[in-house]
Amino acid sequence: MKARGFKTKMRGFKIFSGSAHPAFGKEVSKHLGFPLSKAVIGKFSDGEINIQISESVRGKDIFIIQPTCVPVNDNLMELLVMVDALRRSSANSITAVLPYFGYARQDRKAAPRVPITAKMVANLMQEVGIERIITMDLHAGQIQGFFDVPVDNLYGSIVFRDYIRSKALKNPIIASPDVGGVTRARYFANQMGLDLIIVDKRREKANESEVMNIIGSAKERDVILVDDMIDTAGTICKAALALKEQGATSVMALGTHAVLSGNAIKRIKESALDEVVVTNSIPLVQKCDKITTLSVASLFAEVIRRIYHNESVQSLFT
């Protein structure tokens, strides 16, 4: 996908990038056809974030690219401080472009006396002056309802779809790595015109190991596991092993957000997975031969262009 440049109509537009993923910001700006605007991002001696906008933004429509990935708290705070600086500099509007939305997993009260942190983060973003959110594959779709401003939740499946078709797999089938991800996997299966199977993880009794039940048949199939994020990689690695034991020819995992915490890379290297495909929504620090990274920068660039020109975003995915 290639964003149509709009240099002739960019007088009221500026795009900034935080320090969370500068390479992504540069790639988006390249697709749009003009450079990032400048800001000095630093820290005081005690670790407090200090930001100075280096050019006039008075009356401009601002887009800030900043995934709230590791270190989550620093990157979130940097975003909020930058928004405050821009608002106090008389920006006309401020849109936060969050390829990865951190704190999305705490979207409900799953136990007594716990926070709903996703809602709290939404409140913070709105209170500081963010007027629109562009993000991708939210962990829970209902997070869009935590905001009282427009939220464009993009689908990473648009790049995965093209990649899978280029592989020319002989007997592909889509799989959800757990019951909770069925809706997401079904959506992708429908897009691809493929069947769906489910890996059902159960613990029959306390202190017993988990049993991986597969709903459907993976025998002699090229299985494509679909998830929104890969964190510790435990779930997809266990699912891949169960699928191979049932006779799957190959197992590939698609995960929009490569969080890859702890020993995730080691698990993937030693797993039954043949390939793991992720996007560059988060900077990939560690390398692994099994991991393929697809860029979504052109997708975000085109969405930014469409929003700036008041064009439909949904038509990209239909």
Swiss-Prot record:
Keywords carried by this UniProt record: ATP-binding, Cytoplasm, Kinase, Magnesium, Metal-binding, Nucleotide biosynthesis, Nucleotide-binding, Transferase
CDD domains tied to this protein: PRTases_typeI
Record SUPFAM superfamilies: PRTase-like (SSF53271)
Names of the cofactor(s): Mg(2+)
Annotated cofactor note: Binds 2 Mg(2+) ions per subunit.
Cysteines paired by S-S bonds: none
Predominant localisation class: cytoplasm
Residues the record lists as binding Mg(2+) 1: 139
GO MF annotation terms: ATP binding; kinase activity; magnesium ion binding; ribose phosphate diphosphokinase activity
The keyword Transferase belongs to this UniProt entry's keyword annotation: yes
Residues engaged in binding ATP: 46-48, 105-106
Similarity remark: Belongs to the ribose-phosphate pyrophosphokinase family. Class I subfamily.
Protein's name according to its UniProt entry: Ribose-phosphate pyrophosphokinase
UniProt organism field: Helicobacter pylori (strain J99 / ATCC 700824) (Campylobacter pylori J99)
Gene behind this protein: prs
